[in-house]
Amino acid sequence: MNPAPSQTPPVPAGLLPRLGAVFYDSLLLLAVWFCATAILLPFTHGEALRAGNPLYTSYLFMVSFFFYGWFWVHGGQTLGLRAWRLRVQRPDGRPITWWQALLRFLTAMVSWAALGLGFWWILFDKRKRGWHDLYSETETVRVSRDYLRSVP
């Protein structure tokens, strides 16, 4: 008899599925940025916003955090993570907190700024954790198809 999906220890997610999820999420995030920018247009009287504007950059940064944070805190899966059958969680399997989401997001930004070194770290860590996993005390695991069917 096979153990129930919740009793099976989670398998850490490797680098390639994570990068696949990042690619999917980046396409969705781009669409979210377009909508977030459109919301600002009435306040600029229809004028284009400059990409280097620090307020605009900060605004998009916050939009990005809330995009990822919402999905991570509420179910542990962005659409990209769901498509690749991955989930972000605490080591005990519970959903992450907003504080962990913030730490994870900020550390992931540092990882990207360091030419992805924090993500390449996954290849050398025994539990396949990147800098963002380590610093936020979270993990990214593979989930079964049964788990995906049970989540609305």
What do the PLM-derived regions correspond to, one by one?
Residues M1-A113, G130, L134-P152:
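Short, small/hydrophobic-residue-rich motifs at membrane-helix boundaries and re-entrant hairpins
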